[in-house]
A protein has these predicted regions:
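Alpha-helical membrane insertion/targeting regions
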Residues: 1-169
Length: 169
Protein backbone atom coordinates (compact mmCIF):
# COMPACT_ATOMS: atom_id res chain seq x y z
CA UNK A 1 0.00 0.00 0.00
CA UNK A 2 1.47 3.37 -0.93
CA UNK A 3 1.73 6.27 1.51
CA UNK A 4 -1.25 8.19 0.10
CA UNK A 5 -3.64 5.25 0.48
CA UNK A 6 -2.37 4.49 3.98
CA UNK A 7 -2.69 8.12 5.07
CA UNK A 8 -6.20 8.39 3.64
CA UNK A 9 -7.25 5.09 5.21
CA UNK A 10 -5.94 6.01 8.66
CA UNK A 11 -7.33 9.53 8.41
CA UNK A 12 -10.81 8.12 7.81
CA UNK A 13 -10.57 5.07 10.05
CA UNK A 14 -9.38 6.77 13.24
CA UNK A 15 -12.11 9.42 13.57
CA UNK A 16 -14.72 6.82 12.59
CA UNK A 17 -13.47 4.44 15.29
CA UNK A 18 -13.57 7.21 17.90
CA UNK A 19 -17.13 8.14 16.86
CA UNK A 20 -18.24 4.52 17.13
CA UNK A 21 -16.83 4.35 20.66
CA UNK A 22 -19.33 6.95 21.77
CA UNK A 23 -22.34 5.00 20.52
CA UNK A 24 -21.52 1.39 21.42
CA UNK A 25 -22.40 -0.08 24.85
CA UNK A 26 -19.57 0.03 27.38
CA UNK A 27 -18.19 -2.80 29.45
CA UNK A 28 -16.99 -1.91 32.92
CA UNK A 29 -13.31 -2.18 33.78
CA UNK A 30 -12.54 -0.21 36.91
CA UNK A 31 -8.92 -1.37 36.77
CA UNK A 32 -8.26 1.10 33.95
CA UNK A 33 -9.66 4.18 35.68
CA UNK A 34 -6.15 5.67 35.58
CA UNK A 35 -6.17 5.97 31.78
CA UNK A 36 -7.39 9.59 31.54
CA UNK A 37 -4.50 10.65 33.78
CA UNK A 38 -2.07 8.55 31.75
CA UNK A 39 -3.42 10.10 28.54
CA UNK A 40 -2.82 13.59 29.94
CA UNK A 41 0.75 12.61 30.86
CA UNK A 42 1.31 11.23 27.36
CA UNK A 43 -0.13 14.38 25.75
CA UNK A 44 2.04 16.63 27.92
CA UNK A 45 5.12 14.56 27.12
CA UNK A 46 4.38 14.73 23.38
CA UNK A 47 4.03 18.51 23.69
CA UNK A 48 7.53 18.86 25.16
CA UNK A 49 9.09 16.31 22.80
CA UNK A 50 7.74 18.30 19.84
CA UNK A 51 9.28 21.48 21.22
CA UNK A 52 12.63 19.72 21.66
CA UNK A 53 12.34 18.25 18.14
CA UNK A 54 11.75 21.73 16.74
CA UNK A 55 14.73 23.10 18.66
CA UNK A 56 16.89 20.21 17.42
CA UNK A 57 16.10 20.80 13.74
CA UNK A 58 16.64 24.54 14.15
CA UNK A 59 20.14 23.73 15.47
CA UNK A 60 20.77 21.41 12.51
CA UNK A 61 20.61 18.23 14.59
CA UNK A 62 18.66 16.15 12.09
CA UNK A 63 19.26 12.76 13.75
CA UNK A 64 18.12 14.04 17.14
CA UNK A 65 15.08 15.64 15.49
CA UNK A 66 14.25 12.34 13.80
CA UNK A 67 14.53 10.37 17.07
CA UNK A 68 12.36 12.87 18.90
CA UNK A 69 9.70 12.77 16.19
CA UNK A 70 9.70 8.97 16.33
CA UNK A 71 9.22 9.25 20.10
CA UNK A 72 6.35 11.72 19.65
CA UNK A 73 4.71 9.45 17.07
CA UNK A 74 5.15 6.37 19.24
CA UNK A 75 3.64 8.12 22.24
CA UNK A 76 0.80 9.44 20.09
CA UNK A 77 0.02 5.89 18.97
CA UNK A 78 0.14 4.72 22.60
CA UNK A 79 -2.19 7.61 23.51
CA UNK A 80 -4.62 6.65 20.77
CA UNK A 81 -4.72 3.02 21.90
CA UNK A 82 -5.22 4.07 25.52
CA UNK A 83 -7.89 6.62 24.54
CA UNK A 84 -9.81 4.06 22.48
CA UNK A 85 -9.59 1.47 25.25
CA UNK A 86 -10.73 3.95 27.90
CA UNK A 87 -13.72 5.08 25.84
CA UNK A 88 -14.62 1.48 25.07
CA UNK A 89 -14.78 0.75 28.79
CA UNK A 90 -16.16 3.99 30.27
CA UNK A 91 -19.00 6.38 29.53
CA UNK A 92 -18.14 9.99 28.80
CA UNK A 93 -18.07 12.32 31.79
CA UNK A 94 -20.22 15.45 31.63
CA UNK A 95 -18.59 18.76 32.47
CA UNK A 96 -20.43 20.21 35.46
CA UNK A 97 -18.80 23.63 35.62
CA UNK A 98 -20.88 26.76 35.15
CA UNK A 99 -20.56 30.27 33.81
CA UNK A 100 -17.55 31.43 31.83
CA UNK A 101 -15.49 28.34 32.66
CA UNK A 102 -18.15 26.15 30.99
CA UNK A 103 -17.87 28.14 27.75
CA UNK A 104 -14.08 28.04 27.96
CA UNK A 105 -14.15 24.27 28.50
CA UNK A 106 -16.40 23.63 25.52
CA UNK A 107 -14.38 25.98 23.31
CA UNK A 108 -11.16 24.16 24.21
CA UNK A 109 -12.83 20.74 23.86
CA UNK A 110 -14.45 21.45 20.49
CA UNK A 111 -11.31 22.98 18.97
CA UNK A 112 -9.29 20.08 20.38
CA UNK A 113 -11.61 17.49 18.80
CA UNK A 114 -11.74 19.20 15.40
CA UNK A 115 -8.00 19.77 15.23
CA UNK A 116 -7.27 16.24 16.51
CA UNK A 117 -9.12 14.88 13.48
CA UNK A 118 -7.31 17.28 11.16
CA UNK A 119 -3.86 16.65 12.61
CA UNK A 120 -3.86 12.90 11.91
CA UNK A 121 -3.43 13.17 8.13
CA UNK A 122 -1.16 16.18 8.53
CA UNK A 123 1.23 14.28 10.82
CA UNK A 124 1.17 11.26 8.52
CA UNK A 125 1.82 13.36 5.42
CA UNK A 126 4.60 15.31 7.14
CA UNK A 127 6.19 12.08 8.33
CA UNK A 128 5.78 10.50 4.89
CA UNK A 129 7.55 13.42 3.21
CA UNK A 130 10.49 13.15 5.59
CA UNK A 131 10.71 9.36 5.23
CA UNK A 132 10.91 9.80 1.44
CA UNK A 133 13.54 12.53 1.98
CA UNK A 134 11.30 15.14 0.36
CA UNK A 135 12.58 17.70 2.84
CA UNK A 136 11.37 20.80 1.01
CA UNK A 137 7.73 19.68 1.10
CA UNK A 138 8.26 18.17 4.54
CA UNK A 139 9.39 21.53 5.89
CA UNK A 140 6.54 23.31 4.13
CA UNK A 141 3.79 21.18 5.69
CA UNK A 142 5.62 20.87 9.02
CA UNK A 143 5.19 24.62 9.47
CA UNK A 144 1.45 23.96 9.71
CA UNK A 145 1.60 20.55 11.36
CA UNK A 146 3.78 21.50 14.31
CA UNK A 147 1.63 24.30 15.78
CA UNK A 148 -1.54 22.23 15.34
CA UNK A 149 0.04 19.14 16.90
CA UNK A 150 1.30 21.28 19.79
CA UNK A 151 -2.18 22.77 20.25
CA UNK A 152 -3.86 19.35 20.23
CA UNK A 153 -1.32 17.95 22.71
CA UNK A 154 -1.60 20.90 25.07
CA UNK A 155 -5.38 21.15 24.92
CA UNK A 156 -5.58 17.42 25.63
CA UNK A 157 -3.93 18.14 28.97
CA UNK A 158 -6.14 21.19 29.57
CA UNK A 159 -9.32 19.23 28.83
CA UNK A 160 -8.21 16.54 31.28
CA UNK A 161 -7.45 19.09 34.00
CA UNK A 162 -10.82 20.76 33.51
CA UNK A 163 -12.90 17.55 33.42
CA UNK A 164 -10.99 15.46 36.00
CA UNK A 165 -12.83 16.86 39.06
CA UNK A 166 -16.03 15.39 37.61
CA UNK A 167 -14.75 11.83 37.16
CA UNK A 168 -16.65 9.47 39.47
CA UNK A 169 -13.43 7.53 40.12
Amino acid sequence: MNHKKLILSLSLLLPTAVFILYIIPKFNMETVDFLPFLNAIINGTVFFILIFAFMAIKKGKRELHKKLIYAALSLSILFLLSYVFHHATHDSVAFAGAGLVKYLYYFVLITHIILAAIIVPMVLITFSRASKEEFKTHKSIARLTLPLWLYVSLTGVIVYLMISPYYPY
